[in-house]
Amino acid sequence: MPANVAKGRTFTESARRAQIVAAAIAVINEHGYAAASFTRIAKQAGLSSTGMISYHFANKDDLIGEVLSEATTVAYNYISPRMEAATGYRAKLRARLESNIELVRAHPGHVRALMEIAQNAPKTPEFVDQRFGLFSGHLRAGQEAGEFGRFNPDAMAVAIIGAVDAMVIGLVHFPEVDAAEYGRELADTFDRATRPS
């Protein structure tokens, strides 16, 4: 079966792909994106050869794309219910920011993998663009609803993303820090920055 065939996979094939993706996440966490070779991933997964990876994934970019999909799905499933429970644009922005930071403690491996891929993989503009669009679109809609003040929503989105990423890096390096408290502080900061004057 060609590596890029997505439909008609057996349960065993799907399980093997999931095993390889989990191993790739572990290797990226331990060694970084650049050193995440098929050889290391095969060893981590307990596979007899790299050919078993190549059977399921056309190349490293194909595998990394699946890792990115898995990590973003985990993040979405964690953040989305918290946003849905909030009412109004300001409350939803707070929920998104707080849950983004708390995600570091809930799913540290997936967060580290996302960071490594976003910073080092050559083919991640779609992920970056989608993330930017989520924030800028939310801010723009909130302005139209009168819940946010006057500011450039694109510039504010860049500032928010930069602050989130910096805080995530800090939390990864300092595991003793209270992520929930940091999330509240971050949300407070941007609530003040975006509220109507």
Predicted region positions:
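Amphipathic alpha-helical packing segments from all-alpha helical-bundle domains
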Residues: 73-81, 106, 121-145, 154-158
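N-terminal intrinsically disordered/low-complexity leader segments
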Residues: 1-15
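Helix-turn-helix
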Residues: 19, 27, 31-62, 66
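Amphipathic alpha-helical segments used for helix-helix packing
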Residues: 101-122, 172
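Short alpha-helical scaffolding segments that buttress acidic/His motifs in well-ordered protein cores
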Residues: 100, 114-118, 160, 164, ...
